[in-house]
Curated annotation (Swiss-Prot):
Species per Swiss-Prot/TrEMBL record: Arabidopsis thaliana
Tissue and organ expression note: Expressed in developing phloem.
Principal cellular location given in the protein's record: nucleus
NCBIfam families: myb_SHAQKYF (TIGR01557)
Low complexity compositional bias, start-end: 359-374
Any GO BP: polarity specification of adaxial/abaxial axis
Protein name as it appears in the record: Probable transcription factor KAN2
DNA-binding region: 241-266
Note: Plants overexpressing KAN2 develop elongated and pointed cotyledons, and do not produced subsequent leaves, resulting in seedling lethality.
PANTHER family: TRANSCRIPTION FACTOR KAN2-RELATED
């Protein structure tokens, strides 16, 4: 018999030693060589099985460390079983709480193998690549006979209890209750599905609200419409951009366009008004005080003196006998006296009664009377030959 047979002897059963030796052991201990060989073979298989059971126990202890809620659920298994017995007495015909507790505290080799297969299947399903839209809250149902659907709460202690074929009917009923509670709320999954679709199709960056207004050319007709609207509102000082925009009623015109144009229009109007007021200040500055009228009097005096010189020059040319200095002095003296006699009463009357405009009109009338009467008097005197 070889040391490592190709096919192990499955007829061997490992069990604690019995007080009564069996007949099989007596037959195999017939010879000493056969006894030594059997002891060596049994020692090899015992070591192999011990290593396998130790690995399974280490896996189970690591799972209990990673999932601390399992101990709590196992310790409270009698409470769950009592509730199931109270509500569903037909589910537990032949089960006691002590049997369920011992079956979970000391799992058999078949349960451990099934648990390993379940964990491997769970890891393979979770490590699959996700294609399309990932719906984390609504995974597709896996029709596995021993795997319950994942509950809504990820840290539920009852979800950590493995449901095997040899588990108690109480736990299967508990898992079915969780399944119905998770399926009975379809609005929750629909809501998450809609939010994920909305987040997918929404743009990443929202559109800017404060976009700059496009440039616009102010034509003559548009400006005329603007000026008309400003005049209807009572001038550029009272008009507001919003009211002007409403009165103009132009399609592509914005409030920014009207605001900037109204500001420019106000600056132009104020500068024009300042220039006009500075140009007219020389004429209308002292109109009420009479200084402007005095300038007009000086201008009229110069004009009258020029007229008198024109009158005397043709007389001197026509009459050579009267070209002496005494005649010129008398002629100039008479003209000045006549002008003074006319001017003095007119000034007194105008200062007491008339305004500046009436003074100007009276001055024109007095100048016309002087120019009309003065040439006849010297002509009459010279024609008559009167000498003083």
């Amino acid at each position: 018999m070889e040391l490592f047979p190709a096919q192990p002897d499955l007829s061997l059963q490992i069990s604690p030693p019995n007080s009564k030796p069996s007949s099989t052991w007596q037959r195999r201990r017939s010879t000493t060589d056969q006894e030594d060989h059997e002891e060596l073979d049994l020692g090899f298989w015992r070591r192999a099985l011990d290593s396998r059971t130790s690995s399974l126990v280490s896996n189970s202890t690591s799972k209990t460390i990673n999932h601390p809620f399992q101990d709590l659920s196992l310790s409270n298994i009698s409470h769950h079983q009592q509730q199931q017995q109270h509500h569903h007495p037909q589910l537990l015909p032949n089960c006691n709480s002590s049997n369920i507790l011992t079956s979970f505290q000391f799992p058999t080799q078949q349960q451990q193998q099934h648990l390993q297969g379940f964990l491997a299947h769970d890891l393979n399903t979770h490590l699959r690549p996700i294609r399309g839209i990932p719906l984390y809250h609504n995974p597709p149902p896996h029709h596995h006979p021993h795997r319950p659907p994942p509950p809504c709460f990820p840290f539920d202690p009852s979800s950590l209890i493995p449901s095997s074929s040899t588990s108690s009917p109480a736990l299967t009923g508990n898992n079915n209750s969780f399944n119905t509670s998770s399926v009975s709320n379809p609005n929750y999954h629909n809501h998450h599905h809609q939010t994920l679709n909305r987040a997918r199709f929404m743009p990443r960056f929202p559109a800017k609200r404060s976009m700059r207004a496009p440039r616009m050319r102010w034509t003559t007709t548009l400006h005329a419409r603007f000026v008309h609207a400003v005049e209807l509102l009572g001038g550029h000082e009272r008009a507001t951009p919003k009211s002007v925009l409403e009165l103009m009623d132009v399609k592509d015109l914005t409030l920014a366009h009207v605001k900037s144009h109204l500001q420019m229009y106000r600056t132009v109007k104020t500068t024009d008004k300042a220039a006009a007021s500075s140009g007219q200040s020389d004429v209308y500055e002292n109109g009420s005080s009479g200084d402007n009228n005095s300038d007009d009097w000086m201008f009229d005096m110069n004009r009258k003196s020029r007229d008198s010189e024109e009158l005397t020059n043709p007389l001197e040319k026509s009459n050579g006998l009267w070209t002496n200095s005494s005649g010129e002095a008398r002629l100039h003296g008479k003209l000045i006296d006549n002008v003074a006699e006319i001017m003095l009463p007119s000034e007194k009357e105008l200062d007491g009664k008339c305004s500046s405009y009436e003074r100007i009109s009276s001055e024109e009338m007095s100048s016309s009377s002087i120019s009309g009467t003065s040439p006849f008097k010297p002509n009459l005197e010279f024609t008559l030959g009167r000498s003083h």
